């Protein structure tokens, strides 16, 4: 008989689940007689989850699933005596699955195992966000990939210790590239569920350690070595080719999103996630940092108290007294909203344009046009630290030039985003400087800014 779990009447789910539980218990007893109570409970739970995902089952099918699952859990060679010997001495006949039978630090509880030749891993993540209204709150569930994390700098073909921290706040685009665009429109948030997973990018011939942990004080410095990382109360450590996940314990407190200005990060952040790698080697030559794993975040978050997060700022500078000593001239500056300022340098080679922006990602454009008024003097084409396409043309009685730069800028809370324009000697001329800034919400803009490879 085949039972389809997707077609169970509404009044029967309890009875059907009970029948399935009994069937799974019988299958476990058939495959591994005498399994301990705790081990059996864990096995039954895992087998039921597999069966429910399939949607249909038969008695023989459940037995096959039970045998496969018990093998993955290392229980096929289980005997009570070998289990007791394993617990006491670390020896025995029980097979250990390194990715499952680990303590808080991700180390095996006992026994040894060789790295497999290869691992086949299917990663099924939530492809579409779930957005629901629950009372006054917007509840969002989603999965995001932050990007590849690099190892430390290698020395003698072994990478150095490297640990990086990222603040767990929905308003931070560095760690929540998709969620942050929505979260900045709300005053407060509360995580219902939060986890971080490291998905390996390397083969099984790599040795060393990688890990992911969580520090509930986001103002703390990240661990400086593996001993400090191991001291984190919530962390997972593994081989470079093994997947690692850390589940974050979420409290019931509402906190301000990243756009709120606070003297102490602990008042607005749930904490900070830290990722670590140390002594990674592949037995060959390593001449540069390696991309070791992707960092994936899964979450369910509540957002409350909507707020308007629109922002724009424009700076205009016009001058008819343009000199080489004052690259942007002495004309009046006109600003709107937040006050970007032009600071003329004491030399003719640098000019610093300073923007004060709230937290978020912004697209900043710069437009500079100049004219010498004569054909005899041709100004040198300016360059910028961000790079741009610049032009300089001489026609008739006038020499003029235009440059246009468009680049994303990210601000963490209310910090200053400084853009350096390298402007060489220019003759007296007319100059117009235009620098609008607007909040950037496009995924491409975030991808240009978010680089966790470091």
Curated annotation (Swiss-Prot):
ATP-binding keyword on record: no
Molecular-function annotations in GO: structural molecule activity
Keyword entries, A-Z: Capsid protein, T=3 icosahedral capsid protein, Virion
Source organism phylogeny: Viruses, Riboviria, Orthornavirae, Kitrinoviricota, Tolucaviricetes
Subcellular location, record wording: Virion
Subunit structure: Homomultimer.
A Pfam entry, by short name: Viral_coat
Family assignment from sequence similarity: Belongs to the icosahedral plant coat protein family.
Keyword flag Protease: no
Protein name: Capsid protein
SUPFAM superfamilies, per database record: Positive stranded ssRNA viruses (SSF88633)
Gene Ontology cellular-component annotations: T=3 icosahedral viral capsid
Function: Capsid protein self-assembles to form an icosahedral capsid with a T=3 symmetry, about 28-34 nm in diameter, and consisting of 180 capsid proteins.
């Amino acid at each position: 008989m085949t039972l389809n779990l997707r077609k169970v009447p509404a009044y029967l789910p309890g009875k059907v689940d009970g029948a399935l539980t009994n069937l799974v218990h019988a299958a476990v007893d058939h495959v591994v007689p005498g399994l301990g109570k705790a081990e059996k409970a864990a096995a039954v739970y895992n087998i039921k989850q597999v069966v429910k995902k399939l949607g249909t089952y038969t008695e023989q099918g459940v037995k096959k699933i039970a045998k496969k699952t018990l093998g993955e859990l290392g229980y096929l060679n289980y005997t009570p005596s070998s289990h007791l010997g394993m617990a006491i001495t670390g020896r025995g006949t029980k097979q250990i699955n390194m990715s499952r039978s680990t303590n808080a630090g991700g180390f095996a509880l006992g026994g040894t195992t060789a790295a497999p030749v290869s691992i086949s891993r299917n990663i099924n993540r939530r492809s579409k966000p779930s957005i629901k209204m629950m009372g006054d709150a917007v509840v969002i569930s989603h999965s995001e990939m932050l990007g590849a994390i690099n190892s430390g700098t290698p020395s003698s073909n072994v990478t150095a210790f490297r640990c990086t921290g990222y603040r767990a706040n929905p308003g931070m685009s560095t760690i929540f590239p998709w969620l942050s665009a929505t979260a900045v429109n709300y005053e407060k948030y509360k995580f219902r569920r939060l986890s971080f997973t490291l998905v390996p990018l390397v083969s099984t011939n790599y040795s060393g350690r990688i890990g992911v942990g969580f520090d509930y004080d986001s103002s703390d410095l990240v661990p400086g070595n593996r001993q400090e990382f191991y001291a984190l109360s919530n962390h997972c450590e593994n081989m470079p080719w093994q997947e690692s996940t850390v589940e974050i314990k979420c409290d019931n407190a509402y906190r301000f999103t990243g756009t709120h200005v606070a003297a102490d990060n602990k008042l607005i952040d749930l904490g900070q996630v830290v990722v670590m790698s140390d002594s990674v080697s592949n037995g060959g030559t390593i001449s540069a940092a390696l991309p070791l794993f992707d960092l994936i975040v899964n979450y369910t978050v509540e957002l409350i108290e909507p707020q308007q997060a629109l922002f724009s700022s424009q700076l205009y500078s016009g001058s008819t007294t343009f000199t080489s000593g004052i690259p942007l001239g002495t004309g009046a500056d006109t600003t709107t909203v937040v006050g970007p300022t032009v600071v003329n340098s004491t030399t003719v080679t640098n000019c610093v344009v300073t923007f004060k922006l709230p937290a978020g990602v912004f697209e900043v454009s710069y437009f500079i046009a100049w004219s010498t008024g004569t054909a005899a003097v041709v100004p040198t084409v300016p360059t910028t630290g961000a790079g741009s396409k610049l032009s300089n043309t001489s026609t008739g009685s006038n020499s003029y030039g235009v440059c246009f730069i468009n680049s994303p800028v990210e601000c963490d809370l209310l910090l200053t985003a400084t853009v350096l324009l390298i402007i060489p000697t220019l003759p007296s001329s007319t100059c117009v400087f235009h620098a609008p800034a607007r909040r950037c919400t496009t995924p491409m803009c975030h991808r240009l800014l978010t680089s966790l490879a470091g």
